[in-house]
Structure formats: C-alpha cells, structure tokens
Amino acid sequence: MTGAKPTTTGLTLEEGPIDRKAIDTLRTLSMDAVQAASSGHPGTPMAMAPVVYTLWQHFLRFDPEDPIWPNRDRFVLSMGHASMLLYSMLHLTGVKAVDARYERLGELSVTLGDIERFRQLDSKCAGHPEYRWTSGVETTTGPLGQGVATSVGMAIAARWQAARYGRPGFELFDYDVYALCGDGCMMEGVSSEAASLAAHLGLSKLCWIYDDNHITIEGPTSLAFSEDVSARFRGYGWNVLHVADANDTGALARAFNGFRVTKDRPTLIVVASHIGFGAPHKQDTSAAHGEPLGEEEIRLTKRQYGWPEDAKFLVPTGVREHFRDGIGRRGKALRNAWSARFEEYRKVHPDLADEIERMQKRALPEGWDRDVPTFPADAKGLAGRDSSAKVLNAIAKNVPWLLGGSADLAPSTKTRLVFDGAGDFEASTPSGRNLHFGIREHAMAAILNGLALSKLRPFGSGFLIFSDYARGAIRLAAIMEIPVIHVFTHDSIGVGEDGPTHQPIEQLPGLRSIPGLLTIRPADANEVVEAWRMILALRHEPVALILSRQACPTIDRTRFAAASGLRQGAYVLADAKLGKPDVILMATGSEVSLCLAAWEKLTAEGVAVRVVSMPCWELFERQPEAVRDGVLPAHVLARVSVEQASVFGWERYVGLGGASIGMRNFGASAPLQELQQLFGFTVENVMDAARQQLARARKA
C-alpha cells in the first residue's frame, strides 16, 4: 500500500467521448458477466479499465490478428481474478484464436457468447485466465504473485533474444513486458524474490502496474499491510512512478512514456484506484472484490456511467471500430514491418533466422544429440548429477536456446554449462546461457515458466527437498503444458549427514501427484542419457528430473536390457528364465542396482525373479494395457518395491498385499551406509521381502 487515495471526480480523458464509452464498455461487460455467472470479481475491472484501455489502445505493440507474433509486447494479468477485464479487452480488440500447433485461425479468441457464459464449462472465459485455452492470454494466472514473477522470465527472454539474434540494422527482439498486479501480488513472497532479481539484472523492458486500491477480501489493507511499497521497490533498485488517479488517462500516458525512456532498470507504476468504481454502495469496499454487485447496484452504477441501465452485455456502436483503428491498425503495421525486416534478416543471416523459426515452433536443430555420450558398464559408476552434467553440456552446445541455472546450487547440482561461449547471463552480458537465480526457488520456477512461454527451453536446478518451495509454479507449468525442465538432485536419504531437513521423503510422491508433470528418476548414467533425449523432444510437458548425489553403478547393458526402455516409463531390466517370474522386484533410481544385486543372489538360489526399472510412472501409465501387463503381469502377485522415499503410491503396483521397502518417517543425520542399514535398503532385506512375498503368494 502506498500513496493517498484518488479523488472521486471521475474520468479525465483527453481524447473524447469514444474513449469513455470504450472504458465503460470494459466495465459493464465485466459487471454483467460476473452477475450472470453468480460469481467472480467485478471490482478490479471497474477500477482498472482506464489503465488497461490506455495501455492497449495507445502503447501496447500487439496485433490482434496475430497474438503470437514473436516481437509483440506481453501483457500479464497477474491478479488473475480480474479476468473479465482481460476477456473484455480480447473481445473488443478482436483478438484471433491460435491452435495448439501455433496456427492462426480466423475465429475470435473470445466471443460475446463466451463472455455471457463466463465461468461456465467450455467457455473461453474461465474463472482465471488460462494459457493455451484462450488465445491472447500470455500466461495462466490466479495464484497471486505468479504472474509478476513469470513476467520477469519473459523480460529475461526479451533481453537474451535481443542479444543472441540482434545484428546491426536488425533489431528483431525489443518487446516490452507489462504485468498488472495488486496488493495480493505484493504481499506474496514470490513477488519479492522476482522483483529483487529483476532489479539486479536491470530488466528495463519490464513494467509492473500496481493497483493500489487499499482493499483486500477481509477489508482494508490496513488490517495486515502497511509497508511503503514504493520505498521497497526503490530499495530493490526499480524506477518508481505514481499516478494519483486511475481515471486520469493523461497521467497514465505520461507514466507509460516514463517507463519507455527508462533504460537501466525495471519500472513500477503505482496507480491509486477505487475498487468497484462508480458503484454507489460498494465502491471502496471489500464487497466489490469477489462477488456480484447485484442487479440493483449494477443499474445504479450504469446510471452513474450514463449507461442504459437495463442493457446487458452492451457493446455500443463504434467501440469495436475504435479499437480496430487504434491497437488494431497500429499493431498490424508494426507486425508487417517486423515481418519484412525478418525476411531481409533471413537473406543476411540465414542460420540465425532458421534458429528463430525452430525456437518459435519448439523444434530442435538437426543433430542436436550427436555429442551425447554413452557410458560403459562400471561397478562404481557415476552420481546421477555427474552423468547429467555431461549429457546436458553435450546437448546445450547444439541447442542455442537451451539455457538455465540454479538457486545458488550449480556446483552441487552440476548444471553449469561449461563449453566455450556459454557464459553468464548478467546485465552486462545478456547473451550468457548460465542464469544465476540466487536463493530464490519459487521465483526461479516462475521465471522458468516465463522463459518457456517466450519459446526458450529453460532448465532450473536445486535440491529435491526444496522443490516444495517451487511447487506453485511447477503446478502452473503443468496446467499450461509448457516444457520447463526442473533438475532436482540430492534425491534421497543419500544426502546422509545433512539429516532430515535435507533428506527428501514426501517430495517424490508429491511431484508424481501433479497431473501433466513427468517425474523421472533414472537408475544409472545411461538412463540419464535417455531421459535427456526424451525431455528435449517434449513440446508441451514439464519435467522433474530426479538425480542422485551418490554414485550409482552403470548397469552392463550387454547383459541387461537397453536403457531406451525408459521411454515407456517402466521396463523389464532383468528377467527370470523363459520370462516367467514368480516374484517381481521394482525400483527407481539408485535402488535399481540394489534390486539387481538381490536378483543375482535369488536367481542363484533358483528363484524366478524379474527386476523392473520404473523411472517414470506417468509414462508407464500411458502405455497400452498389453505393454503394462507385459512388464507387470497381473498373475504375478509376489511383488516388492524399493525406493528411498515415502512408500505412498506404490500400492498401485505392488498391490495391497505387496511389500514396499521405503521411508515411513523422516530420515536421520548419519553416513549413507548407516542409513541404508537403519532403514532396510540392503540386499538381504530385499531378498527377505521377496521370499515373504513368494510364501504369501503360494498360500493365496
């Protein structure tokens, strides 16, 4: 919260009656849609309509005919509950739809019928904006703070793309990133993480617009929020501008111009507003925030606007044409000029032009995996993080837009790109491929989303235990179906002496529970190779790659099944004679080798044993039933799972009568070997569990 409340003198538009009519159309469509849905948030659209109108109509470089034009300005509605403001703008400006293959369609992204069915099944106007569902929505928002943090990733992408592809006479990437946010975003910790990093990097193409309306759901912000936001952001190093009244479009224009001329830091525009502007009984109250105004209040508000009181979903004559002649005409001219410039660029820099086109289509360069190593059998082996480092560097040098970093843990997660020319991304070296997120796991994950939404292939790394800090942003990546790569190391009690605070237990099942997220825990170096190959080929799925700190034996693939089995999620690694097992041992990661050692001994005893490596449950569940039954035959009831994590979820595969060797409490601080003995991760314990399962199955 900052500054004084605005006056209630109403609109002070400079352009004329059509501008007020356009602004009030945004307001009334929002009010009517929320009322029709019997749920939603009318107050912020009513307050911020002049702000969004001024930005879109006069400043935003955006062509409604092509909402995925690469050099468009990005607009992020971080306070996603105000979604009707964005939907109304998408409709009135005539934004066209784009399909999942990034093909432009002729139909409107948002029709008036969609607005009338706000928050209803299959309407393009969902309760909160959803990327890929509604064209023109740059990122899914709703959880407060996520949008502004994601916008930092977009601004980093803009800076990197400009540095990578800009050449004398060809400035191809100079887009701005705007994010509209409120008190809720400012209170969420992720916004602080992201704002701090944005200032450090000098992201001058980034503008946050702060709706300072003094109201939250419970009442006035004074109940829980009294900091000076302007001072806080000046402390970060931002340029801070103020607009005393959200209805003053002239002041708004001056603020946006002030952002544009700022070249060394991001900008925060603090806009004082009235939530529920014009509502005679609910303006400036929490009642205007998250519920319909009511029919009578809407009539009175429309009277205040000079609007037909009983008209619903009214778009007056001339409003659509006004937007078409403003943002529509300007955006089309800018896009056409950019397209012509790109064709000239292609003639001079054909290889770079090809890169840009592949990047935009999420395609890969020819021969991108030609340098990927294979690893010989080795009883000592490599830690998952070490083999991953080799594979990642081999791939990244051939995929120029693959970049990333860690939350101050690259020496431990082994994710630093070390080939010639990789470099660090900093304010003074914006073409670097190594990002330094600092100790900001949540912001890192949200920033990765912004990078991916800008068509880069980002990766971020940290310890698996701290994936909890990033979970909100990981979940949004899955909802959006964007190919973000999360590399989580130190994956188990193998962390050893660091103790239970750093030993992940419940994190693996937690990540597996996120729909659409692939969680992969490779068994050895060659499964790591296959994991990276598969990950890079993905276009619409985020991944959590789970890697060990301790060494894992490199399995002899001349004796056991090929690591390419990872692609089906689970595969038979070692089998009984004639492929007819009496007991199945299944595991992920470092515990696969433990099962192989038990297989050797049990086989020598004459037991018919199968070992199944299960690096990715999600991929396995997608396989045809015949494939799944071929790996885990239904008639084999004797089953044992082994994983240094919570046993939660394993009953799906071992059955209610099966055995799961895993963690049922938190770990302890001790050397790894002692912990393995303590918690039963030994060859002898696996063998005993197998024998007990066989005995149980024979009695069944």
Regions found by a protein language model. Give the residues of each.
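Cofactor-binding active-site loop characterized by glycine-rich and histidine/acidic residues
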Residues: 48-201, 416-417, 451
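A short, small-residue-rich loop immediately preceding and capping a beta-strand
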Residues: 37, 73-74, 137-141, 170-188, ...
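Terminal amphipathic helices with adjacent charged low-complexity linkers/tails
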Residues: 70-71, 267-366
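N-terminal capping segment at the start of a domain
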Residues: 25-39, 211-213
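Non-catalytic terminal/interface segments that mediate subunit docking, oligomerization
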Residues: 21, 339-483, 561-573, 579-589, ...
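A short glycine/serine-rich beta->alpha loop
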Residues: 15-16, 33-42, 70-79, 133-145, ...
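Thiamine diphosphate
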Residues: 111, 117-140, 156, 160-174, ...
